[in-house]
Regions:
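Positively charged n-region of N-terminal signal peptides that target proteins for export
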Residues: 1-5
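Bacterial N-terminal signal peptides
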Residues: 6-18
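Residues embedded in well-ordered secondary-structure elements
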Residues: 12, 25-27, 74, 87, ...
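Vicinal oxygen chelate
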Residues: 21-29, 32-42, 61, 82-102, 108-137, 161-166, ...
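Core segments of cupin and vicinal oxygen chelate
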Residues: 39-93, 139, 156-158, 164-166
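Generic short beta-strand segments
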Residues: 62-66, 101-104, 148-150
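A short, acidic/glycine-rich surface segment
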Residues: 66-71, 105-111, 153-154
Length: 180
């Protein structure tokens, strides 16, 4: 299996630098980062992957009662127990919310390649040390896809490498950082 993320990453950099349409009127956001929620098949295994393997820190989670989850359109009458993981410090830190909903058997998508189906396809995480991150992930059974880590062109950052791995549910995780 090949990871097509290097081309997508390069395309994103080129598009960001290219002149385009005039910017829309700026919207006011109290926080400029987003949180990402993901339903997982094995909550403990996923929490270990992201904390012990990648380096997220776990914060206090929260519960969403069934009536609220239903009224909001999140579930069909099932409560949610959410584990919150964070990268960084402070209120603007990136948060990953892991959920496993009791009594359900969610279907996995076709995650062979990022172009296999539409929707959010991968997470990009900038790491301080690619080799150390891969060593931690190897202890959890994760290994790089295809021939990664691959060195990125110097124009994208001298000494930066791109590595794709899969989380316990098969989602592609793109790691970018130096090898030490």
């Amino acid at each position: 299996m090949r990871c097509h993320a290097p081309m997508l990453f390069l395309l994103a950099v080129v598009m960001a630098a290219a002149p385009g349409l005039p910017a829309a009127e700026p919207a006011a956001f109290p926080r400029t980062t987003i949180d990402l929620g993901t339903v997982v098949g094995d909550l403990e295994k996923s929490a270990r992957f992201y904390t012990e393997g990648i380096g997220f820190r776990e914060l206090k989670g929260f519960d969403v009662p069934a009536d609220l989850a239903t009224a909001a359109g999140l579930t069909d009458g099932k409560p949610l127990a959410v584990r919150v993981l964070v990268l960084g410090d402070g209120p603007a830190a990136t948060k990953l919310k892991l959920m496993q909903i009791a009594g359900t058997s969610p279907r996995g998508g076709d995650n062979e390649f990022i172009h296999s189906h539409t929707g959010f396809r991968y997470l990009t995480i900038i790491v301080a040390d690619t080799d150390a991150t891969l060593a931690r992930l190897a202890k959890l059974g994760a290994k790089p896809l295809a021939r990664s880590p691959v060195e990125l062109p110097a124009s994208l950052g001298a000494g930066m490498h791109l590595t794709c791995v899969r989380d316990p549910d098969g989602n592609i995780i793109e790691l970018i950082g130096p090898r030490k």
